[in-house]
Amino acid sequence: LSAYIQVESKNNFFNEFIDIFNILKNTDRDLNVLSDKGNPIFNANGIKIFAISPNTHTDEYLDKIYRKEADKHLNRNNEKFALGHDFNFQSVVLVVQIGELQILYGADLEYHETNINIGWASICQDIDFQKHQFDLFKVPHHGSETSCNETDWTAFLKENRVLKLTPYSRGKKLPDEKMVRKIKTICCNSYITSDLSKKYKKHPLHRKLRKGHKKLSYSHGEINVTSNKKGKLQVTLSGNAVPLSKL
């Protein structure tokens, strides 16, 4: 906000943030600020959702980077925040509890090369997190090597776990063959929304549909996971989704 105030008289580089703020301001919803990540951000109808990242160390780590980038805006009129590899450390990892069912959504979070106080290392060494055993895991960062640690995954996943992930096809393709093999070794019940080795024909409708300024993806399928009364997970695939074992 301080950076926004300083550049308001010049060019407004924070239009998206301000638009979102104004939309929320004009609604009747309450905006809660959580001081303790041990409290759920949602708790109703037997469903609890916890945000377990980013932490205070991440705030401090990224604050220095954002200040440096904001300085470029103020003094050099740059129009882009170039966070590079560090961008993913601000990812919001979610724990969802539905009765006895435990789900972990990994977002795009990665392991930092040297700093164990941020990223996945900080989460996995947290005592409260270590109490969890997850039934379903949304693999972070499209199954990249920098998001995976076999020891940690084995520790926080249940024996009959289900893994699901989405590929990345812009630039370097993720997951690569090495990581596909590794993830299959960790969990035989792993699924991906599309096979990057295949080319999918565009449907005419998808050439016209747009979401904002981006085209909707035409190659991804869906991975639907349900649980019966005994807590057993059942996986239903649609579209171009396939078991990772077929790759």
Task: Please report, for each region that a protein language model flagged, where it lies by residue.
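Short, aromatic/basic amphipathic alpha-helical patches
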Residues: 121, 174-187
